[in-house]
Structures are given as C-alpha cells and as structure tokens.
From Swiss-Prot:
Cofactors, names only: Mg(2+)
Keyword Mitochondrion: no
Name listed for the protein in its UniProt record: Shikimate kinase
Gene Ontology molecular functions: ATP binding; magnesium ion binding; shikimate kinase activity
HAMAP family, A to Z: Shikimate_kinase
C-alpha cells in the first residue's frame, strides 16, 4: 500500500504503538534542532509520556545544565547524562529528548538501541544558528564564534547521528508538520502503512 492508500490515522498510530511495545522513541540531534518541541508533540499524538533528559538531569542534580558544566566540566556532565538516560530508558514506552552530545557516547547508543528507536532531527546550519542565537543557556556555544563551534559539532556528530534508526530533516515549519513527518518515518521504519495526511493527525 502506498502513501496515497494510507491507513486512517488511528489505525496507523495504533499499529505503531504496537510495534514499539516497551521501547521508547528517542530524539537525537544538535542543540536547536527542535528535539524537545517535536518530541513533546509526538508524545501528545501518541498519548505517551514525554521526558527531556536535560530536565531530568537538572532535577536529579538540583543544578542547571550550564551550572553543571561550569562546576564539574563536560566529562562529569556526560557521565551523569549517561546514567540518567539509561535509567529513563528502563521505563518505556515514552518519548525521550536527549542532549546534543548524549548520542556520542557508545554505551548510551547501545542502550538506546536496546530499549528504543532513535530519531535524528537533521537540521541545516543556518536554522540551528537562528535558533540557538536566541538562547543564552548553551554552554558549548560560549565562544567568540558560535557559528564555527556549530560547524565543528556538525562535522563531529553528524556521522554518528546518521547511524540512528530514523532520520527526519527538520526546517522552520510548524511543529505539528514535523511531528507528523516523524510519525510517518517511524511507520516506514516498522513497515506500517503511513498516516493519510499530516493534517489529519494534528492534535
């Protein structure tokens, strides 16, 4: 069945949930890609809990991510991040948004592969720059040339992100549209008929 003969939205969403079982949908990608906003929307569409790993880290540590970076350094932060993500993954199904560096950890990738389905929100540099320039809470971008930092991170991380189960190009569009494209990409990944039209599954 092709996309023009797709299932009614409810049937495909139910089939997708069935294929997920106890696994989580795990969003990966660079800062500014929209992991939290899109992840939250996907969770709503699937009636699943939404977890943001950075928020979980802040809850556990009682410190903000920038404070953790400043006080303990990136290595200690990554170790805490790994522990938190591994714990969260034990409680699927859910939708989990991870920090930009989380997927670079081999043990974290292994845990995600075992307990989830990874979704890379792939964004172009200009979109990322536009989004991150509006926020002041990005420890890795405290630089005289944040664009160069992002370019370096893209060079280092995109080949690893590309090993994700699903890749969805993101852009400056409504989150409902991107979230629906994520759901259709997951349907294709599992061999499920796509949802009829993105507008039909907005909530």
């Amino acid at each position: 069945m092709n996309a023009h003969q797709a299932n009614p939205p409810g049937e495909s969403l139910a089939a997708l949930l069935g294929r997920l079982g106890s696994r989580s949908i795990v969003f990966v990608g660079l800062m500014g890609a929209g992991k939290t906003a899109i992840g939250r929307k996907v969770a709503t569409m699937l009636s699943l809990p939404f977890i943001d790993s950075d928020q979980e880290i802040e809850s556990v540590s009682r410190m903000t991510v920038p404070e953790l970076f400043e006080r303990y350094g990136e290595a200690e932060f990554r170790a805490l991040e790994q522990r938190v993500i591994l714990r969260v993954l034990e409680n699927g199904p859910q939708v989990l948004s991870t920090g930009g560096g989380a997927f670079m950890n081999a043990q974290t990738r292994e845990a995600i592969a075992g307990h989830g389905v990874s979704v890379w929100l792939k964004a172009e540099l200009d979109l990322l720059m536009d989004r991150v320039s509006k926020k002041q809470n990005r420890p890795l971008l405290k630089s005289a040339d944040p664009r160069a930092v992002l370019e370096r991170l893209m060079s280092e991380r995109y080949p690893v992100y590309a090993t994700s189960d699903v890749t969805v190009p993101t852009r400056d569009d409504r989150k409902e549209v991107i979230a629906a494209e994520v759901l259709n990409a997951l349907c294709r990944h599992f061999g499920i008929d796509e949802i009829a039209a993105t507008g039909e599954i907005e909530s």
